[in-house]
Regions:
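Alpha-helical structural signal in soluble globular domains
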Residues: 1, 5, 60-72, 116-124
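Flexible loop/hinge segments that line or gate small-molecule binding clefts
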Residues: 1-29, 112, 138-150
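Short beta-strand/turn micro-motifs composed of small residues
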Residues: 13, 24, 50, 83, ...
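Hydrophobic alpha-helical segments within soluble ligand-binding/sensing domains
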Residues: 23-48, 63, 67, 87-96, ...
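An alpha-beta-alpha
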Residues: 32-74, 180-193
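Short acidic capping loops at alpha-helix termini that bridge into adjacent secondary structure
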Residues: 44-46, 76-80, 128-133
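Short beta->alpha junction loops
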Residues: 52, 79-88
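Flexible loop/turn connectors
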Residues: 94-196
Length: 196
């Protein structure tokens, strides 16, 4: 609506409008790097759990995950992929399936999925990371305080907001501005993927 009226607008992430300021991170690169680091720690069998695949962010994370799998010579068909909304009542059967298929590490698309998976695993008596490791492709303060703390991709929300604000000011002042900006990320390796 705002884009159609050429109202100055900024968003986090990418969208299909060229007249909107867009600030995002390299989600494909982040997923590839996190997965490669986990492969480097010895993990070979993964489950990737993503929400709605109509979102660009989830498609990018999917691509990055598979790039790492293929670059590191892992068989693509031995990795488990689950996409779409995962209802709470079906989470138990998903966990049972992952355990029976000997998945070593679950990579969740975001913090909410990670918290749901961790809660279910702990409720069923599994030990993280001894029985199964967990990582998230999006960080939040909650993942810092969980026990064990969760390995994650960290993108500074403050940096994203500041960049949107900076570009918006440039636009409003009639100065040159960037329509699309990519913000750096950091991989935080924490106890949820520790291997002895």
């Amino acid at each position: 609506y705002l884009a159609e009226r050429n109202f100055p607008t900024g968003v986090t992430g990418l969208c299909g409008f060229d007249n909107i300021i867009q600030v995002d991170t390299d989600n494909e690169g982040a997923a590839e790097m996190l997965t490669s680091l986990l492969i480097g720690k010895g993990y070979r069998r993964f489950a990737l759990i993503l929400d709605d695949m109509s979102y660009h962010v989830n498609r990018s994370r999917y691509e990055g995950f598979y790039k790492a799998v293929l670059k590191n010579g892992l068989p693509k068909d031995r990795q488990e992929i689950h996409t779409g909304k995962i209802r709470k009542e079906l989470l138990g059967s998903l966990i049972s399936s992952l355990i029976s298929k000997k998945v070593e590490c679950v990579i969740c698309g975001d913090d909410i999925l990670a918290i749901s998976v961790i809660s279910q695993l702990l409720a069923e008596g599994y030990r993280i990371p001894r029985d199964i490791a967990i990582a998230s492709l999006y960080n939040s303060p909650t993942l810092n305080v969980l026990v064990p703390a969760v390995t994650t991709v960290d993108v500074s929300a403050r940096m994203v907001g500041n960049m949107i604000g900076k570009q918006m000011i440039q636009l409003l002042q009639g100065k040159e501005y960037q329509k699309k900006t990519m913000i750096d990320y950091e991989i935080l390796i924490r106890a949820s993927t520790y291997r002895s």
